[in-house]
From Swiss-Prot:
Function description: Cross-links actin filaments (F-actin). Stabilizes and prevents F-actin depolymerization mediated by profilin. May regulate actin cytoarchitecture, cell cycle, cell division, cell elongation and cytoplasmic tractus.
GO MF annotations in UniProt: actin filament binding
Region of interest called Actin-binding 2, as start-end residue ranges on this chain: 394-623
Keyword tags: Actin-binding, Cytoplasm, Cytoskeleton, Repeat
Cellular component aspect of the GO annotation: cytoplasm; cytoskeleton
Gene: FIM2
Top-level taxonomic group: Eukaryota
Protein name: Fimbrin-2
Broad class of the protein's primary localization: cytoplasm
Domain (Calponin-homology (CH)) ranges: 124-241, 269-372, 394-500, 515-623
Source organism: Arabidopsis thaliana (Mouse-ear cress)
Keyword Repeat part of the UniProt annotation: yes
Length: 654
């Protein structure tokens, strides 16, 4: 939706090895690696590429990577430019491909933080599994009936996905209510603009539920780039399968821990780690002595599965299964056992013995959903009553987490309060928001064993916040190290707000260096709505009249007249009507191109922070339009001025 200048490489052959989204991602990684010391030499590459998780870190150690790089270019003191870096990247990828061949690890991203892998290969087994999943969960959809079921042995999936409807529907299966389906363009024949709107809605909504989509654009979906599309699908399905792996959805998980301190630790774990902990908890009830640490090599012999299912479904237990010597035969018996339990599964015995991490995780998640074997007694659950269940804190934590994860894929956190405590990711985020501000020479990289080094990092975080004029009267570095929730959220809000205001300042060429304020955003929004002939007004970002969502729909209609179907808008009187309008507002904003991380409840409750970010995101999208003309800041009419420069738009508020 925004302007985009492609990254050019002087060597045509090298240029043709990558898509523009890949070049953009690799350029971002390269710039980030170079930024630490101002230059990048061959000797630096191995460690910095490993830290940035650019190339197959699950397959190459730093030592292996360093050896390969040295073999390719022995002079370690030479400085690395971007094209040299691309050639190194291709060589390492070729080596990784040679190792994994057509086997287990040759698959789309699923367990990884990043949504899409840059390997241009996909696993047919995974594709078939995801198609089976889609056929199962979307079989009753009225619009998709004409193209379902999809043939898992063909590439029909990527054709069906091209109009964006299937991906939007799949997101709603994973996290119900994320997309207001009234906002999806579902005509039988979509024009390019309508199709692009669906893709934009899909990608912004995927970001909003926790997917990282930095390597994929709307054009990739249109072109049916299989490895990229499958990467998005796999993460959406993963989010669905792991949705119950938290104490809110499954309070019985408290049985896995001993006291309230352990409960807090459990709450901070990513869902796949909780799933592993649950699996080992059940296995301790058997004679199985090993600890399962992954969904690949540790389950390849199917022994862990045999014991797990014997515990969960003893009525189908057969002692002879453990005596089977062939892993493949044992895997087949495991799947028979799962079938008898009524547990739907989409993997084969071959997938188990080959250790497919994505499909094994999906299999265990299905088992957990079907029969978790946890106590329904309330005795252990009493621990939960002693924990503060602050819904607002949980909601803001999720918004800030997804915001941090949305930058460029080089940073990924699972829990704001745990993953930011050493200060390193906060420093990285500060450097993205205000490039060059961090003094990397006095910063310590993880793993950080000495506590005072964490405090030093966090002290710099606080110092830089004050430099950016944050209000940090009661915040010290040690508060971040200690995981003080309210103070961390207060810092992150100011960091997000600074990011938004700087983006707007960069786009408003007529600001003459003037800082943009909350009042400027408020006046811009009111002027837009007023000039569109509407009488509604927002008096502040706390204005309770915003709860019906109508003002934001009028704002969206003023910046893109065809965006709102007013026949779908309610009066916003009852709670249900307000929720319908709020959901519609969020979906229309994402459909235009706004990357926003809020829930309908934030609009209904008039969450001041989220009202500001929503308005600013709509303003930012409007100012980025290539033909949009603007007057100086504070002008009531923003339809005159000069063309905008969109070169600063590589950010998470889009």
């Amino acid at each position: 939706m925004s302007g985009f200048v492609g990254i050019l490489v002087s060597d045509p052959w090298l240029q043709n090895q990558f898509t523009q989204v890949e070049l953009r991602s690799l350029k971002s990684h390269f710039t980030s690696m170079k930024r630490e010391s101002g230059k990048l030499t061959v000797s630096d590459l191995a460690s910095r590429m490993g830290k940035s998780k650019v190339v197959g870190d699950q397959n190459l150690s730093n030592e292996e990577r360093a050896t390969l790089i040295q073999n390719f270019h022995p002079n370690l003191n030479d400085e690395v430019d971007f094209e040299f870096y691309l050639r190194i990247y291709l060589n390492l990828q070729a080596h990784v491909n040679a190792i994994i061949g057509s086997g287990v690890k040759n698959s789309s991203a699923f367990l990884k933080a990043a949504t899409t892998t840059l390997l241009h290969t996909i696993s047919d087994s995974e594709k078939s599994s995801y198609v089976a999943h889609i056929n199962n969960y979307l079989s009753g959809d009225e619009f998709l009936n004409k193209c379902l079921p999809i043939n898992p042995s063909s590439n029909d999936l990527f054709e069906v996905a091209k109009d964006g409807v299937l991906l939007c529907k799949l997101i709603n299966v994973a996290v119900p209510g994320t997309i207001d389906e009234r906002a999806i363009n579902t005509k039988s024949m979509l024009n390019p603009w309508e199709r692009n709107e669906n893709h934009t809605l899909c990608l912004n909504s995927a970001k909003a539920i926790g997917c990282t989509v930095v390597n994929i654009g709307t054009q990739d979906i249109i072109e049916g780039r299989r490895h990229l599309v499958l990467g998005v699908i796999s993460q959406i399905i993963k989010i669905q399968l792991l949705a119950d792996l938290n104490l809110k959805k499954t309070p019985q998980l408290v049985e896995l821990v001993g006291d309230s301190k352990d409960v807090e630790e459990l709450m901070s774990l990513p869902p796949e780690k909780i799933l592993l902990r649950w699996m080992n908890f059940q296995l301790r009830k058997t004679e199985y002595k090993k600890t399962v640490t992954n969904f690949s090599s540790d389950v390849k012999d199917a022994e862990a599965y045999t014991n797990l299912l014997n515990v969960l479904a003893p009525e189908h237990k057969n002692p002879s299964h453990l005596a089977v010597k062939s892993s493949f035969e044992r895997a087949k018996l495991v799947l028979e056992h799962a079938d008898k339990m009524g547990c739907r599964r989409y993997l084969t015995a071959k997938d188990i013995v080959e250790g497919s991490p994505n499909l094994n995780l999906a299999f265990v998640a299905h088992i957990f959903q079907h029969r978790n074997g946890l106590s329904t007694q309330t005795k252990q659950i009493s621990f939960l009553e002693n924990l503060a269940d602050d819904i607002q804190i949980s909601r803001e934590e999720k918004a800030f987490r997804f915001w941090i994860n949305s930058f460029d894929g080089s940073v990924y956190i699972n829990n704001v309060f745990e993953d930011l405590r050493d200060g390193w990711i906060l420093l990285q985020t500060l450097d993205k928001v205000s490039p060059g501000i961090v003094n990397w020479k006095v910063s310590s990289k993880p793993p950080i064993k000495l506590p005072f080094k964490k405090v030093e990092n966090c002290n710099q975080v606080v110092k830089l916040g004050k430099q950016l004029k944050f209000s940090l009267v009661n915040i010290a570095g040690n508060d971040i190290v200690q995981g003080n929730k309210k103070l961390i959220l207060a810092y992150l809000w100011q960091l997000m707000r600074y990011n938004i205001l700087q983006l707007l300042k960069n786009l408003r060429l007529h600001s003459n260096g003037k800082e943009i304020t909350d009042a400027d955003i408020l006046e811009w929004a009111n002027a837009k709505v007023r000039n569109n002939g509407c009488k509604t007004r927002m008096y502040s970002f706390r204005d309770k009249s915003l709860s019906d969502g109508v003002f934001f729909l009028e704002l969206l209609s003023s910046v893109q007249p065809r965006s709102v179907n007013w026949s779908l808008v309610t009066n916003g009187v009852t709670d249900e009507e307000k929720k319908m309008n709020a959901t519609y507002v969020i979906s229309i904003a994402r459909k235009l191109g706004c990357s926003i991380f809020l829930l309908p409840e934030d609009i209904i409750e008039v969450n001041q922070k989220m009202m500001l970010t929503l308005t600013a995101s709509i303003m930012y999208w409007t100012l980025k339009q290539p033909l949009h003309l603007n007057k100086p800041i504070g002008s009531p009419d923003s339809h005159n001025g000069s063309l905008l420069d969109d070169s600063t738009s590589d950010s998470s508020i889009e």
